Design a protein with these regions (language model features):
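Short, well-ordered loop/turn and helix-capping segments at boundaries between secondary-structure elements
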Residues: 7, 43, 59-66, 80-88, ...
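Acidic/His-rich, divalent-metal-binding segments that scaffold phosphate/diphosphate chemistry
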Residues: 2-50, 65
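Regulatory modules associated with amino-acid/nitrogen control
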Residues: 97, 101-195
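Feature representing long, continuous alpha-helical segments
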Residues: 3, 32-39, 51-59, 72, ...
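Composition- and surface-driven signal marking solvent-exposed, interaction-prone regions
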Residues: 14-19, 47-52, 70-76, 89-92, ...
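A structural signal for short secondary-structure junctions
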Residues: 28-29, 55, 108-112
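Acidic/histidine-rich catalytic neighborhood
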Residues: 62-63, 67-119
Length: 195
């Protein structure tokens, strides 16, 4: 996980442009690294590994003299490190109630940024073969929709985002036959594919 975080911080500004920008804007990168170190520490100890890891990370962070706020954030990240992946893949992220509930969990955009980056790097480290554009898209959509909610911005429906992107693609094509062919392909996919 740490290796992926470091690489995302230095490289990957093409494949992970948004994430590269986010990781380099974090107020305290060490919080992300410590959450990455502790997120699976509770595995094999009997019980919920997220809860065990959260308690362990909180104790450690206090012991090394981190502020209570930083210690709480690390512990919260460890406790919730599976939430974003689970919600993005198992719930309907186009449902405003899903976004509202997740926004209540994360509370603010800073926590959201940290959790999003931890989630992506955890999935990529666990099994790189499981990481794909579809999962990335779901996570990114959940992130962007939740960020809009937390910033009190109007949340654009996925259908509207999808239509805008399709129109941009159509505008770049020259021939009518290309547009017709592409239109038939677009009908094979739901709106979430284009968001």
């Amino acid at each position: 996980v740490i290796k992926n975080m470091r690489r995302m911080q230095i490289h990957f500004d093409n494949e992970f442009k948004l994430e590269h920008e986010l990781i380099n804007r974090l107020p305290k990168i060490e919080i992300l690294y410590l959450a990455g170190l502790f997120h699976d520490l509770g595995k094999g100890k009997g019980g919920n590994h997220s809860e065990i890891g959260a308690a362990t990370s909180l104790s450690f962070a206090k012991r090394i003299g981190l502020s209570l706020g930083d210690a709480d954030l690390i512990s919260w990240l460890v406790l919730n490190h599976l939430q974003m992946s689970s919600i993005s893949q198992k719930k309907d992220i186009s449902d405003s109630q899903t976004i509202n509930s997740f926004a209540e969990l994360v509370i603010d955009t800073e926590r959201l940024d940290y959790l999003y980056l931890l989630t992506i790097n955890d999935i990529r480290a666990t099994n790189p073969a499981l990481w794909n554009g579809w999962k990335h898209g779901l996570l990114r959509d959940l992130f962007l929709l939740t960020r809009s909610k937390l910033n009190k911005e109007p949340i654009k429906p996925l259908k509207e985002i999808s239509m805008h992107r399709k129109n941009n693609i159509f505008a770049s094509l020259k021939g009518v036959s290309e547009k017709e062919l592409l239109k038939s392909y677009f009908e094979l996919f739901d709106d979430s594919y284009f968001t």
